[in-house]
Amino acid sequence: SYCKSKKLAIDVINGPAVTALNKTGIEVFDAKLIVEQARVIKSPEELKCMKAAIEVAEIGINKMREELKAGMTEDELWSILHKTNIEHGGEWIECRILSSGQRTNPWMQESSNKVIQRGEIVSFDTDMVGPYGYCADISRAFVEGHKFNEDQKKLYLMAVEHINHNSRLIKPGMSFKEFTEKSWKLPDEYYGNRYSCMVHGIGLCDEWPMIRYPT
């Protein structure tokens, strides 16, 4: 046999294939982590593809902001991003994370037929697989009517501070541990509803690494 090793790492495989390989004496391992770590470093061509996906996502985001108005449903607003992606040669969207008003907390709820009310905050996460199959994962929050009340302004400015602080930290050679130690500290009142991670990789989809909040 040309396969001298008895261990084989595969990223995607079905059950019957694993069984068949096992019968020949080959032990199958999950290659996901190996492949994800290899995908961390992007080629110049990949970076161009990622920028193209981001550009399309930003076009869609701007259209959503312009067309947001009281009386439309969350689904109607979300459809603008999907339409824009397809119009520009994009592929698909992983999910439909968009919510308004009280539905924004807890986070991660998908768009619905809820009617957006005047002055409500609207938050969404694109998770958009755009042109060339690369993902643009961008979160944004708008307010219907574009006039923030004091509570909305406080939360929004806190989010901006959070993102800017952590973005400035990132540099070549920094360990995950150092990043975690120097990262922006969530106020105690919001820690319980924190996101699953502070930062994560991106490429064909959400990718490794994923750096969690300190506990």
Residue locations for each model-derived region?
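Active-site neighborhoods and metal-handling regions in enzymes and metal-associated proteins
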Residues: 1-215
